[in-house]
Design a protein with these regions (language model features):
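Flexible, acidic glycine-rich loops studded with aromatic residues
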Residues: 162-167, 175-185, 192-264
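Substrate-binding cleft of carbohydrate-active enzyme catalytic domains
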Residues: 1-161
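Short Asp/Glu-rich motifs
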Residues: 56-58, 172-173, 220-221
Length: 264
């Protein structure tokens, strides 16, 4: 589900009324049962916990976690968490610890897409962090955030997946380049309207998973299955780098489904 809310039950989060959820949520016990049910059928469930964007459920309770103390909708997307506040990383590490305790999957998906950076630009704290790290762009600052989460997951013996927005910080292969996403992060390609993304992903050393919004998002009732079955993602990857292709994913977003029958 791509709505900015948590649908699991983190034990340490103090909920604030009904501002964070709609439509209910899964308890940890329910999720453990779901993981076991899937495992018995040789299916591994990989959780996605979005950050630093799509986090309105967090900022509704902890507005101090944003760069400006603002917990609202921005110009296009929700206001993201601040990459310059240590308490944000501490909080997210607690969340990820609980997620990893429930989901034994090798991979953890952290989102990292659709991050509106206006509040970062307004924040003296964010600008100071950029100066200290030698970054020239706010995309590099996003990569810094993602890399810190990536390193934490690796310390815990897990691998990280993120959306392709996270590659915009720079190229680690450029001498002296700063702000690049760690090459050991797996990247899901979804921004089909941005030219050259798949090739850039693999040229920066990442494994890639194809799930371009067109045609791989099946939320649209008019989406033709023919285009999914005949999608040729390998045509976008140089022959010498095709070993970095993990595979593909057809994406169905739960909030766009009104009932199970429509999902089926």
């Amino acid at each position: 589900k791509d709505q900015p809310e948590f649908e699991l039950d983190p034990r340490f989060i103090v909920r604030n009324g009904d501002r964070t959820l709609y439509g209910g949520y899964y308890t940890q016990e329910e999720l453990r049962s779901l993981v076991a049910y899937a495992r018995e059928r040789h299916v591994e469930i990989i959780p996605e916990i979005d950050m630093p964007g799509h986090t309105q459920a967090i900022s509704a309770i902890y507005p101090q976690f944003t760069a400006t103390g603002e917990a609202s909708w921005g110009t296009i997307f929700s206001v993201p968490l601040s990459p310059a506040k240590e308490e944000v990383y501490t909080f997210l590490q607690h969340v990820l610890d609980e997620v990893m305790d429930i989901f034994p999957s090798r991979y953890i998906h952290i989102g990292a897409d659709e991050v509106e950076k206006n509040t970062w630009r307004e924040s003296a704290e964010c600008r100071q962090l950029m100066d200290r790290l030698g970054f020239k762009t706010y995309e590099a600052l996003q990569s810094h955030f993602v890399n810190r989460i990536h390193d934490y997951l690796q310390q815990k013996g897990r691998e990280m997946i993120c959306w392709d927005d996270a590659i915009e910080g720079g190229d680690y292969q450029v001498p002296g380049g700063k702000g690049a996403l760690s090459p050991s992060a797996d990247v899901m390609y979804w921004r089909y309207w941005v030219g050259g993304v798949p090739q850039r992903v693999v040229e920066q050393g990442h494994h890639i998973i194809f799930t371009p919004g067109d045609p791989m998002y099946v939320a649209r009732p008019d989406g033709p299955l023919y285009d999914i079955y005949h999608y040729q993602g390998l045509d976008l990857i140089p022959d010498s780098l095709q070993h970095l292709v993990r595979g593909g994913q057809v994406s169905l977003w739960g909030e766009s489904m009104s009932n199970f029958r429509r999902a089926d």
